[in-house]
């Protein structure tokens, strides 16, 4: 028993060193700071037990979804073939109204499908810790949209970013940094105006952004179907999803179910 406890403590210490070290050659080279390292070392032990419930560990791939209307940021963790919802964080502050960001200085938070690479992390942020979501993406550029440095960060002040407070961003940042260090080349950040249910879409059907949101809903539905974030590209000013026929099958299944219901 004592030997087992010591072995567990050794493995935990090794994991903390592995995930929180600034310069292990086997890991991706990621900019760190004394703050990001101390935060990682502080949170790693508690994350071990929490992530184990999802058959996951610190450094496994993550996926983030943001919903403006309900002020929610979800962190999903991949412990097997699919992602599981790890935690939902309340967004302290974001800017503007429902709808996409269009230009620099409009004080509007973006919507769409983005991804974060290791060079998007900022451990020296003026807002505690932060990462750039990658706005503008190819879709935004196709519409001539401008803006820069759109972040998920600490504090509770936003001029286009998603401000989470310092304690919450510490957790989100540590999970993101560990995943990128552990060979996830990037993680996706999907930003929606609201949960893209049929009821919510109907409630907003008169919005000038409804066509844009219908395009976002395609990607939302794919993830809801099998808990795997779809690969996303932009063609002819639209988001296009590499579905492996997932979306087509889902539509067919829903149509079939609807016909059965009508017969009954």
Over which residues does each language-model region extend?
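Short internal beta-strands
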Residues: 190-192
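Bacterial N-terminal signal peptides that target proteins for export
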Residues: 2-12
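Bacterial N-terminal signal peptides
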Residues: 12-22
């Amino acid at each position: 028993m004592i030997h087992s406890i010591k072995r567990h403590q050794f493995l935990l210490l090794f994991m903390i060193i592995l995930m929180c070290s600034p310069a292990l050659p086997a890991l991706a080279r990621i900019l760190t700071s004394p703050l990001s390292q101390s935060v990682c070392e502080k949170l790693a032990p508690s994350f071990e037990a929490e992530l184990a419930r999802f058959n996951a560990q610190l450094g496994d791939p993550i996926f983030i979804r943001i919903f403006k209307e309900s002020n929610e940021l979800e962190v999903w963790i991949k412990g097997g073939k699919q992602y599981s919802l790890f935690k939902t964080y309340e967004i302290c502050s974001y800017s503007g109204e429902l709808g996409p960001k269009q230009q620099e200085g409009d004080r509007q938070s973006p919507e769409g499908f983005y991804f974060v690479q290791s060079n998007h992390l900022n451990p020296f942020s003026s807002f505690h810790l932060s990462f750039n979501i990658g706005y503008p993406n190819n879709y935004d550029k196709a519409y001539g949209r401008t803006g820069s440095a759109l972040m998920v960060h600490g504090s509770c002040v936003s001029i286009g970013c998603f401000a989470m407070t310092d304690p919450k961003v510490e957790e989100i940042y540590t999970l993101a940094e560990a995943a990128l260090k552990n060979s996830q080349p990037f993680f996706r950040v999907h930003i929606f105006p609201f949960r893209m249910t049929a009821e919510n879409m109907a409630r907003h059907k008169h919005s000038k952004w409804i066509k844009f949101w219908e395009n976002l809903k395609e990607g939302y539905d794919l993830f809801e179907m099998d808990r795997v974030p779809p690969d996303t590209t932009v063609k002819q000013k639209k988001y296009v999803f590499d579905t492996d026929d997932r979306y087509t099958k889902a539509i067919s299944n829903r149509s079939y179910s609807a016909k059965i219901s009508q017969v009954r």
